[in-house]
């Protein structure tokens, strides 16, 4: 795959360890859900090294001191439904004051193209750093459509987080939206004829919610 300045593969031993757990078909729904949240927390930690901050004065038991804190109201989390919901709580662990929106999409199994069915976003989202999340970046169709919806609403700083990415999807999003920072935990081999990532982990939504 070509290299892109806006694509970041988070090569960290803790993330690799947890990705191995969610790949395993023997992993239970409960454990899968928990580990997805843990990976999301680790990814958000890396992706938000440039999080907006401000200076405040804190009173310690001994004296006053100037400290740097996060502007928590400057962040919005937007999961692509339904699998993206599995990553939200992990990110809220770091940013409990973040606003949460939702973009609902499903994949047409014949065309493999995304179909939007729901979009509800926080007020003034155009003033926030938006973290768009989906565990899988496969064809890139859903991610691109979701990014377009955010840009239509004036969003200027968007970060897209996916736990597992396929080269086809990563390239598509990177080329169509070079202004969006893309973070993946791991880059897999390819897509199969049905648009699933190989080796992947199966259907993330089904495994998070225990459905078939």
Which ranges hold each PLM region?
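PRPP-associated nucleotide enzymes
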Residues: 1-212
